Structure formats: structure tokens, C-alpha cells
Design a protein with these regions (language model features):
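Active-site C-terminal subdomain of aminotransferase-like
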Residues: 1-107, 111-139
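PLP-dependent enzyme catalytic core of the Aspartate aminotransferase-like
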Residues: 58, 124-125, 134, 140-175
Length: 175
């Protein structure tokens, strides 16, 4: 629903009447096909199917490992808050139970009592987790947003965006 600069600002969902029923296919033909190609290479297709076939196993391990870590952190004296759907109460827990069937995901956020310095020290002391900004890998990943992805913001701006000084985010892998 946004103007496409590569087609002179065309908005595919607002095409004239004779083309309205074709909006999706025109968008697919003009941009998606151009950007991704008509078909996967055989090797890419092989990798895709290998990943798809093992997805349920990997997701189950992500969820189990993240749940174990969240429960451990929830009882740790240096952690003031854990953000994980499986530990929430009230409406949030009900939503998680309704929508996250089979597990609560692989992301765990937590606040360290020592603030920004504790967050940096925690990240620097990790041996198993990779210190990167992305999430959803088979490997365990960790980041301290206050000193990395949000470091250009003032402390007030960080807090307004939901990033507190001691907040650490883990993307729990399948190790």
C-alpha cells in the first residue's frame, strides 16, 4: 500500500478498476519476481527443504531451552525482571497460551540489577553465546541493546523506546 518508486510511485492496491483484481499478481510479477527470481536453484531448494523438514524439532528445542533459561533467570538474585511469555501473568499469559502452542518461543529478555555496566560485563563474559544483533539462529545469541544497537540514543530516549540500562536480550539456540 505504499508507492513503489521503481514503478513511478504506483500503489498496486489502488490501481484503476480494470486492474484492481490483478493488483496482487501485478505486484508479484513486477517486484517480487524481479527481486527473488522465478525459481530457486536446485541447491537452494535442497537447503530449503532440509530446513523445513527439521523445523518442528528445532523450534521444540528453542522453546525448551529458552523456558529453562527464563526459569533460571527468574530465580537469580542479580536479575530484577525477566520478559518471557511463559512467565507472564493475567491477560498476557492467556494470550501466550492461546497463540503460542507447543512453546513460548526462543527469545528471553531480562534486566540485570547492576544497570549498564552489569549488562556490558555480562555480555563480555559470555562463552557460548555469540554477541550479535540478529535473532532466530540455531546458535545462541545475546545482545546488550543499551551499549550496541541503541547506543546512539540518550538514556532518556533509550528508556522511551523500551531499552533500559541493564536489559539483555537472548535468542536461545538449540545447543
Amino acid at each position: 500500500n505504499t508507492p513503489d518508486p521503481s514503478y513511478h510511485g504506483a500503489i498496486f492496491s489502488q490501481l484503476p478498476d480494470p486492474l484492481t483484481p490483478l493488483a496482487f499478481i501485478l505486484k508479484a510479477r513486477t517486484t517480487l519476481l524481479r527481486d527473488m527470481g522465478g525459481a530457486m536453484s536446485p541447491f537452494n531448494a535442497f537447503q530449503f527443504i532440509q530446513g523445513l523438514e527439521t523445523l518442528p524439532l528445532r523450534i521444540r528445542e528453542h522453546c525448551k531451552n529458552a523456558s529453562d533459561i527464563a526459569n533460571f533467570l527468574n530465580s537469580h538474585d542479580k536479575v530484577t525482571n525477566v520478559i518471557y511469555p511463559g512467565l507472564m501473568d493475567g491477560d498476557y499469559k492467556k494470550r501466550a497460551d492461546d497463540h503460542l502452542l507447543g512453546g513460548f518461543g526462543g527469545l528471553v529478555g531480562f534486566e540485570l540489577a547492576g544497570g549498564a555496566e552489569a549488562g556490558k560485563k555480562f555480555i563480555d563474559g559470555l562463552e557460548l553465546h555469540y554477541h550479535v544483533a540478529n535473532i532466530g539462529d540455531a546458535r545462541s545469541l545475546a545482545i546488550h541493546p543499551s551499549s550496541t544497537t541503541h547506543s546512539q540514543l540518550t538514556e532518556d530516549e533509550q528508556i522511551a523506546s523500551g531499552v533500559t540500562p541493564g536489559y539483555v536480550r537472548l535468542s536461545v539456540g538449540i545447543e
